[in-house]
Amino acid sequence: MICKSQTCTKIGGSTNSTFLALIPKNKGATDFSRFRSISLCNTSYKLITKIIANRLKKILSVIIPKNQGGFIKGRKILDNIMLVQEAIHSSYHRKEKGIVIKLDLTNAFDRVRHDFLFSVMEKFGFSKVLITWVKACIASPWIALLVNGHLMEFFQASRELRQGCPFSSLLYAIQASVLSFQLDYYQ
């Protein structure tokens, strides 16, 4: 059942249920980190999140810092890699001292704090209605592992953004923008 009001706080029933398929990254994978998880979301859920994603896409390129290349239409992470290489090369030839920091955000989608994300969205000026719909979509998802074609029991997830969900990468970009702003501030 999908809620019909603008104050929707929870998407109920099977709409917020997801099957999580684990695909081995290489042959003979036994450790959980050697699997890629794919979220097989309900079609109604995907439609709702696609509508929200389309709204987010219209404004993210304006509010997300230009140096943040990932997940924003028209930007590429490769551009940032080339920019860093050029900066290092230039500093080396001018004999300037500096520091380079590489951050590895492994499994970053699994470590999103929802309360922080919603706070950032409020600071950016997103409408309460949009934030409420995002909350309804990512709050209390029910997940069942799909192992060798068999479903395991459903459990409730708490802090992840679903990979394969139309707006997960955009929500992650919103949260990650805080780091970009902080790096710019202390530059």
Q: Where are the regions a protein language model picked out?
A:
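Nucleotidyl polymerases of mobile genetic elements and RNA viruses
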Residues: 1-187
